[in-house]
């Protein structure tokens, strides 16, 4: 052990003679001495020298007088931004020098980190950037279905570059080395433009019909000169009755022979017989049998 003996050999023999055994547990003094030895082992002389030289340099910076060029620069600056007294100026300059030294030391420590960490961070950043570029188009948008580009991201960060393979339909594999987001976005846009040109040529110029609004309105009126388009077939049938003159909805009130082409017209007419007024104003107690009459009445309260 590196521990210094706290007893002499005679005291140890006397202790064995009196008690019959010798305790192997270290005493408080031995523990303290062992701690001192461990501290001296980990705290070598080189850090002490650096700290001592740094303290001496710090004293030189704190007690040194600022050069005249710094004083002239202080005088040229706005007096509201700097203190008036010269002593405070000297202290602020010394603090600036100290902060610059601390900044230099911190930058030096950061530069000593291994290059692998910077390479990993570079790869991680480029991975996030590539994910952001390739996820610019939502899955449900029509642009994705037209510009179908299968992307298989193959990253190789050996030389600090990232390789993105773009596989387009009816095209060969094209490996593009991406250096940043702008280059990746340009590559994806170019591939999309090629695919869009192919899709437009295949479809025969049906770009206007590919819009979501036009996809919904698929029910067109077949009568000559009519351009009405509806999203539901029932609405189309009700509209076609205006051309044919058909009125299948007959009023069931006794003695009434009115017929209508639409069911909502029959319901509105039936309220005249019953006197029902289901549309009530929120600002007053008036009720109406038709919703458009209520809308006209609501304009008075505005």
Swiss-Prot record:
Changing residue 264 to N: Found in a patient with developmental delay/intellectual disability, neuromuscular and psychiatric symptoms; uncertain significance. It is found in: Nucleus. GO terms for cellular component: chromatin; cytosol; nucleoplasm; nucleus. A motif (9aaTAD) lies at residues 93-101. Pfam families: zf-C2H2. One of its GO terms (molecular function) is RNA polymerase II cis-regulatory region sequence-specific DNA binding. Its main location: nucleus. This is Krueppel-like factor 7. It comes from Homo sapiens.
